[in-house]
């Protein structure tokens, strides 16, 4: 029952989170900083109350290691959200971030000296090809935007290239953070809830450098049209409602993934998260009518098929950790 409940949380939380993020970004493309700050603040407060026990519970992993992890996590979060302000459409944003396997493999080979089977190299080639196709076709769409002069068109394309560079940087940084986490957990044991709290609490002072931008968007949000929240009947600016729902659904998504990791194998978790991304992508295309050609569909299929090939989820689908433990006892 718990795995099914967790899957429901992941799909409901993560998919709706993407919807509210796109609603925010479509109205104010530069709102990434205030969105990131709100998410970090909410999760930090929740963790301070329930995980850190109001600061009375000492961390299992030394703070100096969290400081390194937090620097990377903060950078990745800010850069990923800011990329939406650089002519990056939400579908491309989701597809590009789905390429984390490539970055993980590359850095795993370089840093951890890992070696992989030819099957996994093939799957990574599929993912790479899919991302390249989607990126290339998106580049063509940027260059042929209607209503833009040659100068404005070139400027839009230049900003788009900067957005691609930002996403690439965030992808590699995220993979490096994953490797760092792997080494920490190997040394100190897994403390995912604790890591979640410190990863969101420690970076909060860093938002001081983004205070001006955050304040500007607070003003913009206050000026948005009023919206009456269903059921409770409270009236508030619609942008604040979108932000509130984005933060809440982000938390639901994270909690769902956490429950899933305690109940199922990592491969099953990967499958659920991958399918969730695919559903979010489809919804974004259909509901928001984002441009998506047959080439985009081909690239998307390459990305998701390659991801499923890499994880070999069909061999472990539905296997819970308790079942694995039973099998171990039999052996």
Curated annotation (Swiss-Prot):
Motif, Mediates endoplasmic reticulum retention: chain positions: 326-331
Transmembrane segments: 4-24, 30-50, 59-79, 92-112, 124-144, 153-173, 201-221, 229-249, 251-267, 268-288, 294-314
Name of this chain's protein: Nucleotide sugar transporter SLC35B4
GO biological process: regulation of gluconeogenesis
Species of provenance: Mus musculus
Family: Belongs to the nucleotide-sugar transporter family. SLC35B subfamily.
Catalyzed chemical reaction(s): UDP-N-acetyl-alpha-D-glucosamine(in) + UDP-alpha-D-glucuronate(out) = UDP-N-acetyl-alpha-D-glucosamine(out) + UDP-alpha-D-glucuronate(in); UDP-alpha-D-xylose(in) + UDP-alpha-D-glucuronate(out) = UDP-alpha-D-xylose(out) + UDP-alpha-D-glucuronate(in)
Alphabetized UniProt keyword annotations: Endoplasmic reticulum, Membrane, Sugar transport, Transmembrane, Transmembrane helix, Transport
InterPro entries membership: SCL35B1-4/HUT1
